[in-house]
Amino acid sequence: MPKGTGKVIAQNKKAFHDYFIEETYEAGLVLQGTEIKSIRAGRVNLKDAFARIHNGEVWVHNMHINTYEQGNRFNHDPLRTRKLLLHKKEIDKLAGAAKETGYALVPLRIYLKNGFAKMALGLAKGKKQYDKRHDLKEKEAKREIARVFRDRQKM
């Protein structure tokens, strides 16, 4: 995560399971009033979200932000596509990399930084099934080692 980040609102844990994250970028979000209120309340889901580049702009799809409870008829659509704010050079770099086979733009987390909602966007390459199994075995081995050390210190 970039330096100086604030409170993490939501994380996409599935992205780290399904993809190798090669690079991360910080992007601003273009939101409506009721959307930022719902995000501050922690009512956002990144599980099935993905980003695409269209006409030189980056858009995030399937990011679910629940409707604001105190909102009225001006409440937002929970699944609308939202624009991400990045520098032109970053967009060009992402566009070139995303055209390569096997690469995707995946939202990793949403956090608040200096009062603004930001998204960590990852340039990711898909994992094969055997890669996922290998990662799970490594994770379990680390847990087992930590458990042994913890038990040894108690004695």
UniProtKB/Swiss-Prot annotation:
One of its GO terms (biological process) is trans-translation. GO terms for cellular component: cytosol. Transmembrane segments: none annotated. PROSITE patterns: SSRP. This is SsrA-binding protein. The gene is smpB. The lineage of its organism: Bacteria, Bacillati, Bacillota, Bacilli, Bacillales. Required for rescue of stalled ribosomes mediated by trans-translation. Binds to transfer-messenger RNA (tmRNA), required for stable association of tmRNA with ribosomes. tmRNA and SmpB together mimic tRNA shape, replacing the anticodon stem-loop with SmpB. tmRNA is encoded by the ssrA gene; the 2 termini fold to resemble tRNA(Ala) and it encodes a 'tag peptide', a short internal open reading frame. During trans-translation Ala-aminoacylated tmRNA acts like a tRNA, entering the A-site of stalled ribosomes, displacing the stalled mRNA. HAMAP family: SmpB (MF_00023). One of its GO terms (molecular function) is RNA binding. It is found in: Cytoplasm. Keywords: Cytoplasm, RNA-binding. Signal peptide: none annotated. NCBIfam families: PRK05422.1, smpB. It comes from Bacillus cereus (strain G9842). Belongs to the SmpB family.
